[in-house]
Amino acid sequence: MFRGKPNSIETLILQATDEKNTKEKWDVIMDACDQLSSTSGDVGRNSIKFLNKRLDTANANIQLLALTLTDAIVKNCKTSIVREISSRTFTDSLLKIASDSTTHNRVRSRIAVLVNEWAEIMKKDPNMSLMQDICEKIRKLDIVDLRAPKKPEKEAMNELELKREEEELQYALALSLSESTAQSNKVENPQSTKDEPLQKTNQRQESNLATSPASTVSRVRALYDFAATEQGELSFKKGDIILVLESVYKDWWKGSCKNAVGIFPVNYVQRVVEPTIEQQRQSAHMEQQVFDALPQIDELLDTLSTTSPDAADDDALQGKYHAMIALRPKLVRLIEKYASQKEELMDLNERLLVARRDYEKLYEQSMSEMRNF
């Protein structure tokens, strides 16, 4: 009736999928992959069954971490272990979770994307055909669009389009200046402007990129992976943030991503919508709520460290616990927000260092030529 003590691999699975994890523990994940690849017989099979149980839970964080671990297993473990991932039991679990409308949208989307990748990896092995079948069924659920669009042709911009690009740039600069002035006035008169400017800003931000000049867009987010096939193209992964520099062709823009510069197709990205003033206010309020709760968290930890197990049913203690647990989604969103900002700032720092290095090199060359005269 009761399971025995978890084996070493199951312990690693528990550590890698712990609901308290705020990010993937890749050292634990790769250790689990190494140990799985060195097993034989029922140990590996039972470990995958244990992973399946972690996946089949109501906790979205555990599910996402279990999917990350599963992805690492598919891409790093030996064939006999990967075949366990494509077993009837495991694939049925994936389909059940993806089909359940009560499953968190991030989990459903993650399953759809990963199953599509796994089906591609396993398609050459007839013993893993179940993953192909499940992939087709999940595609029909239409959770996410997995089909990357066709790359557009590199058509040169005509004079009319170049003129429009310049006009839009001047308009964007003037609009930015007027909004800056309006924002200064709003600080002095907070009741003078409200919903209308925000609605106009949102409408402008959400316009179709296909008809938007690059001069009106500062940042975009990748919707699909894009692998450069020609010199000068910019490779990126889905979710990457790209700084838009200029239009090069009709449907291709030049941009910078992770210290690389190149052109990319506009239909592979979407505009990064900047938060409105109201959204910024709400975000700041949520962040303050989390920091204001720090003393309560410390108080709960102190209480738990000195309370006997018999007090677990205490209503006051349970109330404090559930109040703190309710903060976790907000905390996770804040972590994601600042992780993204950190990545963008590090990318910006790298580009500034390159620019500084190039400038200093150019300056030294110039000074050297002057000294030779």
From Swiss-Prot:
Keyword Membrane: yes
Membrane topology: Peripheral membrane protein
Record region (Disordered): 180-213
Subcellular location: Endosome membrane
Keywords: Endosome, Membrane, Protein transport, SH3 domain, Transport
Protein name per UniProt: Class E vacuolar protein-sorting machinery protein hse1
GO molecular function, one term: phosphatidylinositol binding
Species this chain originates from: Schizosaccharomyces pombe (strain 972 / ATCC 24843)
Species classification: Eukaryota, Fungi, Dikarya, Ascomycota, Taphrinomycotina
Homology family: Belongs to the STAM family.
Subunit structure as annotated in this protein's UniProt entry: Component of the ESCRT-0 complex composed of hse1 and sst4.
Record-annotated UIM domain positions: 164-183
Polar residues compositional bias, start-end: 180-192, 199-213
Domain SH3: 215-274
Gene3D superfamilies from the UniProt entry: 1.20.5.1940, 1.25.40.90, SH3 Domains
Keyword Ribosomal protein found: no
Name of encoding gene: hse1
GO cellular component: cytoplasm; cytosol; endosome membrane; ESCRT-0 complex; fungal-type vacuole membrane; Golgi apparatus; nucleus; prospore membrane
Domain VHS, chain residue ranges per copy: 16-146
GO biological process: ascospore-type prospore assembly; late endosome to vacuole transport; protein transport to vacuole involved in ubiquitin-dependent protein catabolic process via the multivesicular body sorting pathway
SMART domains for the chain: SH3 (SM00326), VHS (SM00288)
Role according to the record: Component of the ESCRT-0 complex which is the sorting receptor for ubiquitinated cargo proteins at the multivesicular body (MVB).
